[in-house]
């Protein structure tokens, strides 16, 4: 079975390593190079550059970059149809009289390309049209050669397993989503059902940080690289197809991950605002500071930022009497690390340190890098917005897409890390399903704990008591 090198091998210190596969200079027109780097090309020429022949196999960085960015210009099934056509016609796979030796030379290369596509962008093949074309081309390669037949079978079985795992994951997400209810509703109907706070479920902040890392890595793992591009898909001005392109905007796993960040922030705020006694609220704040600190040590920056966001929500930050009982030195250090000034300079420095540690890791724990996800999306958004997809001559601006692919492939390396910590089902269940307060309910709980300080807060408190509790 053709093996693809790991994502970390795609780059050298200067950026893209174009020498992983020795390839001849492209003979078809429509591609523009500078210093041996591909900068732009017509869409047609770029598609041809993707297709191997007897003497040529595209560099892996090119394959990843083009498969990632091409969806801004055409549907993956349209690209697959073109690739199949070029393979069949140019390599004469459909001709029974074609040279068997030539087919033996080209077949492993086409199979390698299909393997790279199915391994890196498996979600493309949820589309029946993609799967049909894949099986058709694979069948042509495999006919008459037992070795290729086994390899094709292995590739398709591996793809089907990945798609089945994705469907299962989506079912679990849907189940979690349908069972999560507003905490205030539960409190009013079954007050005894959620007496347990997070410290009762998990008294050790280090263990909680590890369980948060489990959730983060599982959710990261299911995000397809294409979702970063599909999140910003817009109609290509040179595309004459007037049909809706929303089909390309499939980002459900990315959205589920952003929702998890929001849930964790609200969970932190809920756990802090819930206790009636001031000392219990202060203890809860100190507990989450320790959890956040351990997240930082692990390299789990997403949970760290979600916890800080929860503690900085107005209903929590206004609890001045509670905060007065908290030793905040450790929290101040964490806030400094995630300070948004200078475009998150401190965080980016820490992230680079974690990424470097991951590259030279001696243990699976040292490999963990979980970026602050909203900032990663923002960076990719600004990269996408800051440069045109096409140049004035209609060429695809490939220089932009090298940079996009570089950012996404780094993420791909991080998301493939196995979580080394033991799973605790009880803690995970609590983190994922315990009801949390809405923003209004958080404010109400906050005012009930420490009364309103001015007329605006008093009016809001009365309004919330009336609307949420039915009291005046």
UniProtKB/Swiss-Prot annotation:
GO MF term (any one): guanyl-nucleotide exchange factor activity
Matches recorded under SUPFAM superfamilies: Ras GEF
Principal location listed in the UniProt entry: other
Domain N-terminal Ras-GEF intervals: 34-164
InterPro entries named among the record's database cross-references: Ras-like_GEF, Ras-like_Gua-exchang_fac_N, Ras_G-nucl-exch_fac_CS, Ras_GEF_dom_sf, RASGEF_cat_dom, RASGEF_cat_dom_sf
Endpoints of the signal sequence: none
Pfam family, one: RasGEF
Stated role: Guanine nucleotide exchange factor (GEF) with specificity for RAP2A, it doesn't seems to activate other Ras family proteins (in vitro).
Name of this chain's protein: Ras-GEF domain-containing family member 1B
Organism: Bos taurus
């Amino acid at each position: 079975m053709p093996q693809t090198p790991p994502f970390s091998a795609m780059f050298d210190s200067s950026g893209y390593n174009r020498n992983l596969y020795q390839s001849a200079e492209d003979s078809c027109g429509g591609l523009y190079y500078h210093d041996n780097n591909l900068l732009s090309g017509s869409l047609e020429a770029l598609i041809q550059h993707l297709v191997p022949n007897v003497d040529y196999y595209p560099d892996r960085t090119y394959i990843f970059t083009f498969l990632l960015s091409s969806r801004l210009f055409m549907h993956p099934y349209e690209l697959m149809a073109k690739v199949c056509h070029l393979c069949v016609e140019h390599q004469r796979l459909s001709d029974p009289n074609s040279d068997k030796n030539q087919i033996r030379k080209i077949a492993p290369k086409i199979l390698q390309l299909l393997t790279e596509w199915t391994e890196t962008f498996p979600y493309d093949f949820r589309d029946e049209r993609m799967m049909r074309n894949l099986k058709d081309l694979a069948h042509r390669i495999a006919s008459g050669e037992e070795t290729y037949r086994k390899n094709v079978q292995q590739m398709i079985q591996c793809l089907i397993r990945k798609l089945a795992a994705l469907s299962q994951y989506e079912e679990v997400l849907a189940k979690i989503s349908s069972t999560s209810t507003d905490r205030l509703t539960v409190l009013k109907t079954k007050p005894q059902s959620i007496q347990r706070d997070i410290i009762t479920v998990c008294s050790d902040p280090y263990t909680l940080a590890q369980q948060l890392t489990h959730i983060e890595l599982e959710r990261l793992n299911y995000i397809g690289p294409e979702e970063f591009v599909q999140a910003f898909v817009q109609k290509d001005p040179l595309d004459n197809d007037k049909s809706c392109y929303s089909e390309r905007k499939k980002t459900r796993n990315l959205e589920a991950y952003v929702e998890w960040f929001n849930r964790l922030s609200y969970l932190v705020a809920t756990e802090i605002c819930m206790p009636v006694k001031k000392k219990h609220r202060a203890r809860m704040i100190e507990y989450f500071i320790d959890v956040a600190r351990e997240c930082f040590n692990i390299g789990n920056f997403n949970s760290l930022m979600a916890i800080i966001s929860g503690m900085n929500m107005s209903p929590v930050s206004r609890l001045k009497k509670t905060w007065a009982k908290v030793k905040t030195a450790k929290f101040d250090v964490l806030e400094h690390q995630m300070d948004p000034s200078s475009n998150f300079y401190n965080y980016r420095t820490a992230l680079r340190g974690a990424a470097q540690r991951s590259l030279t890791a001696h243990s699976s724990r040292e490999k963990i890098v979980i970026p602050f996800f909203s900032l990663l999306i923002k960076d990719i958004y600004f990269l996408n917005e800051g440069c045109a997809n096409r140049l004035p001559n209609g060429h695809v601006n490939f220089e932009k897409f090298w940079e996009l692919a570089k950012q996404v492939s780094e993420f791909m390396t991080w998301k493939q890390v196995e979580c080394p910590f033991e799973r605790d089902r009880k803690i995970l269940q609590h983190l994922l399903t315990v009801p949390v307060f809405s923003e209004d309910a958080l404010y109400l709980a906050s005012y009930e704990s420490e009364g309103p300080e001015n007329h605006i807060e008093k009016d809001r408190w009365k309004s919330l008591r009336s609307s949420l509790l039915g009291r005046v």
